[in-house]
Amino acid sequence: MVCVTNGLRNAFILNEYQSLRTRVYMLGGELKPGAASITSFTDTNSLTEQFVYDFSFFSCRGIDLDGVYEASLGQAKIKQQIMRRSKHSILLVDEHKFDSPHFYKIADFADSHSVITNTLPTEDYQKRIDDGITNFIWLNPKLRSQPNE
């Protein structure tokens, strides 16, 4: 497996799973204070364009029915590049990011193949689901199995 990430925590976790025979590539740039991720990328275009991604998982600052947004231009640009080269892009978004547009638009909402979230979508988002634009996967944290006592 080959993984490309800008997240330091992701890279460290993947590094621990040597049994997966994982090769990890880090995108170079400026370390964002307190975020454990690289922003303000330097010459990442050449690296990101070398790969064809089967799956890309990415977070965002917010979404609305028209788009997926990021607070940093550097983060937005790298996510756009990777989404364009991904066979399946998967957006990870928690309940606080719905109906929360931000400064830089990464993509149209419908450009994500799937959205994984921890909240039921509102009626407007449900209409998009019913129209088949995007696949929503709702992970209900209350349904997690509890340890036996």
Per-segment meaning from a language model:
Residues M1:
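A short alpha->loop->secondary-structure connector
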Residues A11-E149:
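Conserved phosphate- and dinucleotide-binding cores of soluble alpha/beta proteins
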Residues V4:
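Short, conserved beta-strand segments within well-ordered enzyme catalytic domains
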